Amino acid sequence: MKRVLLTTGGTGGHIFPALAVAEEIRRQYPAADILFVGGSYGPEARIVPAHGIRFEGLPVRGVMGRGLKAPLALAAMTAGVARGMRLVGRFNPDVVIGFGGYAAFAAMVAAKLREKPCAVHEQNSVPGMANRLLAKIADRVFISFPDPQEYFLQRKTVLTGNPVRAAIAAAGAHRAGHVPACRLLVMGGSQGAHALNLAVVNMLPQLRDAGVEILHQTGAADLETVRSAYDKAGVQATVVDFVEDMAAAYAWTDLALCRAGATTVFELAAAGVPAVFVPFPFATHDHQTANAAFLADRGAAQSIAQRDLESMPPAVLAGQIIDLLKDHGRLQGMSAAMRRMARPEAAAAIVSGAKDLIRKKPLRSLVPEREGE
């Protein structure tokens, strides 16, 4: 494996699994040349180079939900495919792996037109529109959750789990003997979540009186408002727009109050962190609700619909959070259930599957089967 092109972007939920695979490729093939192709306007343009990986941006934007701007986005996507064709021809990758999102679309189509081996990885239990389309042209489809609905052709689909970075897995090892200390991690994904921010701000007096320590990722839009609310409530906490070191955050906390994007779900599982999920209700095909249900049904988490969160008296939500934080036995049981859902071998499985694709080997199981799958 000499040259690998990875492509995705738009949100951390797509970007970080791709970075985990890049990390594994570097571990197995230190001399491999990795090129990451994403959107010029997405967070990948900042995040990927910061991880020491060469990045090429295509001037593409999402087409779905853009209304009158959709024709312009479609024109940009077409131009992105043309530019992607030149880029793929120049780089000449052994294999191309896409991780979903509109930013992967142009590069994947370009790679297929160049007749390069192509694979896609789907992070969520319900696939997004980009991967539903790209799976039709891909040679392999790697999935994070079992696929009882058969969204993808079974003859080219293999379960791998969702890859997490080595530092996140190491946080899980660090937490093996973790003694709960009434610590809460609040995060709404890489861009924050206004509904979560508001809910936590409204219950700050109860959390303060219960002695709860808080690390709160607000997203950029709400940072100053939330910081001001903590100051007014007299709550000492770490309030940031973005947590740079998620591994340290997972190692520190006892419980997460968060969205249920697939990357968050699998990182929590790898780290063994129990969660109260508030799925983003407007996610494509409501995939976050399905992700949360998968963990809640197995005793690793609780799930609250956003409409219920918004109508719930602050004291009720605070009571639910505080009761969990004070119940060490229950937290430890949820943590153990989280660990059972982890897929620490996911990145290696995807690299192995990509290697099979290059060598034109038939589809095979890449991870051990588990009870209930």
Curated annotation (Swiss-Prot):
Enzyme class: transferase
Family membership noted in the UniProt record: Belongs to the glycosyltransferase 28 family. MurG subfamily.
UniProt entry tagged with the keyword Glycosyltransferase: yes
Gene that encodes the chain: murG
Source species of the chain: Oleidesulfovibrio alaskensis (strain ATCC BAA-1058 / DSM 17464 / G20) (Desulfovibrio alaskensis)
Pathway where it operates: Cell wall biogenesis; peptidoglycan biosynthesis
Positions bound to UDP-N-acetyl-alpha-D-glucosamine: 11-13, 124, 165, 190, 288
Source lineage: Bacteria, Pseudomonadati, Thermodesulfobacteriota, Desulfovibrionia, Desulfovibrionales
Name the UniProt record assigns to this protein: UDP-N-acetylglucosamine--N-acetylmuramyl-(pentapeptide) pyrophosphoryl-undecaprenol N-acetylglucosamine transferase
Protein's cellular compartments: Cell inner membrane
One of the record's GO cellular component terms: plasma membrane
EC number, UniProt record: 2.4.1.227
Stored CDD domains: GT28_MurG
Membrane topology type: Peripheral membrane protein
A GO biological-process term: peptidoglycan biosynthetic process
Chief place of localization: membrane
A Pfam family per the record: Glyco_tran_28_C
GO MF annotation terms: UDP-N-acetyl-D-glucosamine:N-acetylmuramoyl-L-alanyl-D-glutamyl-meso-2,6-diaminopimelyl-D-alanyl-D-alanine-diphosphoundecaprenol 4-beta-N-acetylglucosaminlytransferase activity; undecaprenyldiphospho-muramoylpentapeptide beta-N-acetylglucosaminyltransferase activity
Enzymatic reactions: di-trans,octa-cis-undecaprenyl diphospho-N-acetyl-alpha-D-muramoyl-L-alanyl-D-glutamyl-meso-2,6-diaminopimeloyl-D-alanyl-D-alanine + UDP-N-acetyl-alpha-D-glucosamine = di-trans,octa-cis-undecaprenyl diphospho-[N-acetyl-alpha-D-glucosaminyl-(1->4)]-N-acetyl-alpha-D-muramoyl-L-alanyl-D-glutamyl-meso-2,6-diaminopimeloyl-D-alanyl-D-alanine + UDP + H(+)
